[in-house]
């Protein structure tokens, strides 16, 4: 199972992508618990804000898009963990899974 975090926007408008293969993580069960506890169905669309980041978080079968100001609590914890264990790569806008 993979977790993908794509961050777009900001002043430079870059798209950065971090990916983690949970099966390769020594604390896989902790990751799964965090992911299973996320309020995937409660994320609401908000108007875009200039020069702010937007995060697209995917872990099949789930996907959520959050504005920077929505990235709190367990969402922030997940994004921080993904960024700690994965190096970012640049991707073409609209194509975060392209390698």
Locate predicted features:
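Function-determining sites in protein domains
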Residues: 1-99
């Amino acid at each position: 199972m993979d977790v993908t975090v794509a961050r777009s926007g900001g002043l430079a408008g870059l798209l950065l992508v971090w990916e983690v293969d949970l099966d390769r993580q020594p604390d896989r069960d902790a990751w799964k618990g965090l992911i299973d506890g996320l309020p995937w169905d409660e994320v609401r669309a908000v108007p875009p804000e200039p020069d702010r980041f937007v995060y697209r978080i995917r872990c099949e079968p789930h996907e959520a898009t959050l504005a920077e100001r929505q990235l709190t609590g367990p969402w922030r914890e997940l994004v921080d963990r993904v960024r700690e264990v994965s190096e970012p790569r640049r991707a073409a806008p609209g194509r975060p899974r392209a390698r």
